[in-house]
Structure formats: structure tokens, C-alpha cells
């Protein structure tokens, strides 16, 4: 009985921790998509695709970096890899110019 209770408590704690991380990724991706949709004419489906892609990028980066004690160079390597993967994923739906504009607007959203 103690093992079941302990397992349940650990699962709830893990879900709570994961929800906090996802909240950051969700907020950041929502802000970026809001700016992107205000500047570019894209469909709701494309906006949803961009938001999900950016959310996955931010959440993945956080999982790879948080609590790992990585150096600045190692963090930059994680960010570069994620940026390349995101660019490739966006290229499946958008052309090169649109992808560059999306990335520029995403970066601009960090400053707001």
C-alpha cells in the first residue's frame, strides 16, 4: 500500500513539474505566433502548425538544458540544433522567404 501511495505522489509531482515547464513554452509560443499572425497573412491551420512547432522547440530545449549544469557553449549547441530542426520543419509547409520572416518575427517577439 505504501508503494502505491508513494508512486501516486511521485506521478502527481512529476506532472506538476512538467506543467510548469510547458506553461513557459506555451506562453512563449503564443506570444511569437501572435506577432507572426499580425505581420503575415497565414491561415489558422498554419498558425496552429507554427505554434505547435515553436512549443515543441521551447519545451525540448528546456528539457535538455534545465538542471543539467551545461556550459554556455553546450547550451548554444542545443539551441543551434533546435533552430536547425525547427527551420527544417517549417520548410515542409512554407518557402524559404516565409520561413526567414517567421524566424525574424519569432526573435522579435522575445524583445516584447
Task: Tell me the role of every PLM-derived stretch.
Residues 1-24:
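Bacterial Sec-dependent N-terminal signal peptides
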Residues 20-112:
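Charge-rich (acidic/polar
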Amino acid at each position: 500500500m505504501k508503494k502505491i501511495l508513494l508512486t501516486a505522489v511521485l506521478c502527481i509531482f512529476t506532472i506538476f513539474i512538467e506543467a510548469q515547464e510547458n506553461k513557459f513554452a506555451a506562453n512563449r509560443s503564443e506570444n511569437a505566433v501572435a506577432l507572426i499572425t499580425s505581420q503575415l497573412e497565414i491561415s489558422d491551420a498554419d498558425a496552429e502548425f507554427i505554434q505547435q512547432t515553436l512549443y515543441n522547440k521551447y519545451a525540448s530545449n528546456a528539457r535538455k538544458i534545465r538542471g543539467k549544469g551545461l556550459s554556455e557553449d553546450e547550451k548554444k549547441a542545443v539551441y543551434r540544433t533546435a533552430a536547425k530542426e525547427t527551420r527544417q520543419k517549417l520548410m515542409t509547409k512554407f518557402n524559404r522567404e516565409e520561413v526567414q520572416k517567421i524566424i525574424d518575427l519569432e526573435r522579435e517577439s522575445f524583445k516584447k
